[in-house]
Amino acid sequence: MAKYIFVTGGVVSSLGKGITAASLGRLLKSRGLSVAMQKFDPYINIDPGTMSPYQHGEVFVTEDGAETDLDLGHYERFIDVNLTKNSNVTAGKIYWSVITKERKGDYLGATVQVIPHITDEIKERVYRVAKEKNVDVVITEIGGTVGDIESLPFLEAIRQVAIEQGRENVMFIHVTLVPHLGNTGELKTKPTQHSVKELRSIGIQPDMIVCRTELPLPQELREKIALFCNVSVEAVIENRDVESIYQVPLELERQKVDEYVIKRLNLPLGQSDLKEWREYVEKEKNPEHQVEVALVGKYVDLHDAYISVVEALKHAGVYHKTAVNIRWVNAEKVNDKTVDELLKGADGILVPGGFGDRGIEGKIRAIQYARENKIPYLGLCLGMQCAVIEFARNVAGLKGANSTEFDPNTPHPVIDLMPEQKDIDEKGGTMRLGVYPCKVIEGTKAYEVYKDELVYERHRHRYEFNNQYRELLTSKGLVISGLSPDERLVEIIELKDHPYFVATQFHPEFKSRPLNPHPLFRDFVKAMLNLKINNAE
């Protein structure tokens, strides 16, 4: 029988509930327990797929093609498990499902209400993950903050789960803020007390309180929080700011959080094995080398829009004992006059995924700079499409070459809408999504990187390489090194006579892990290191 852990948040949003939940998942897994994770988001959107990155950050894509919250990326990276669409549930999905059932007549004769119909649907999603994975523990993060109107049905549902499953099989962890006053440096517990009071008023008594704080939490404050919030002192956990999110599991282990949780849920206490994780954190703290990559995008003011790319670069850097510093370059500011000033000195250039025509010409100019100056380049999704456009214009001589996404009347549509997308009007959930096989061509840089002729990667796109230009562009030197097994879709392109110029239609960043960096990022960092060493000599 699965045990259930629910992670809620109080006082303010963006406290790091996701990292806390993911870290606990890592600790439990390190003791031999199987773990599944999920996130409940109280917004009415079906998924974040159509939201602006400025509203939501990155959209993380699962193997089965769900567009999900960026916290799922943290979950996958920490517990090293591929999650599914069942791991991200929004209020929109819940209401959609209930209304659909009502229209079909599933509730015939009943007045459909928040309780029990909405709450039953939420509970079913919790249990579904446990059944799907057949795991020892399900960790569910509740998005938002206690007290939000949108969160109430979710909190009511998890209260009911505790009754149905037995209190001994359910644990509530509340993540809260303990702020300090700048003039005195005094830590204040009152916001935490009020947050827990709010939680208890709807029938949930937290079993553990994780206190986000910039300063150490003195023993007397722990005792005060324990007294006023009705938990044991050892269940008041200090969660201070750290340099790297990968230190958080070690900080929680130091305070015996995993032991407390395992004892509370009456789970077997296996031997903890965090040796490789500790080694990773140690290498991350003490790099032997440094490289700088210019990330050219249009959402560079919000780094969370590219969080999986950032983490994949970190993983690859640690593999090479190298700190990868990111130079955030706004694509809209890149042009012939500014390109040298903005990109000079970068050891590598990366153009990530994106949509729309804003900043496109800047990205194309940055790619030209990488190609002409033999700077290692990695293009992801849109970064591949822009690389094809740049090559078509400046090497193949196709003046005005473009994607029909940006210029429907381009004389040379080297990137075009996928045929199966042409009759689709709706935006949400209609792209080519999820994992697909890619055949890697022997004798190419991609094959050298993967060392495998068939790989599986995650996608999120509507547009593709236009095969009418395949023969022309390859005759001019473009190398197609990855194809769909039926050879219809171009998945990877590269250039010869270049230290590292590789671009993919898929998103390799979604499959990178701290202890297993993605090979494309690993070799990209290696190429940057080699270039830096050669230049120094």
Curated annotation (Swiss-Prot):
Mg(2+) binds at residues 71, 141. One of its GO terms (molecular function) is identical protein binding. Allosterically activated by GTP, when glutamine is the substrate; GTP has no effect on the reaction when ammonia is the substrate. The allosteric effector GTP functions by stabilizing the protein conformation that binds the tetrahedral intermediate(s) formed during glutamine hydrolysis. Inhibited by the product CTP, via allosteric rather than competitive inhibition. It holds the Pfam family CTP_synth_N. CTP binds at residues 13, 148-150, 188-193, 224. SUPFAM superfamilies: Class I glutamine amidotransferase-like, P-loop containing nucleoside triphosphate hydrolases. ATP binds at residues 14-19, 71, 240-242. Belongs to the CTP synthase family. HAMAP family: PyrG (MF_01227). Homotetramer. This is CTP synthase.
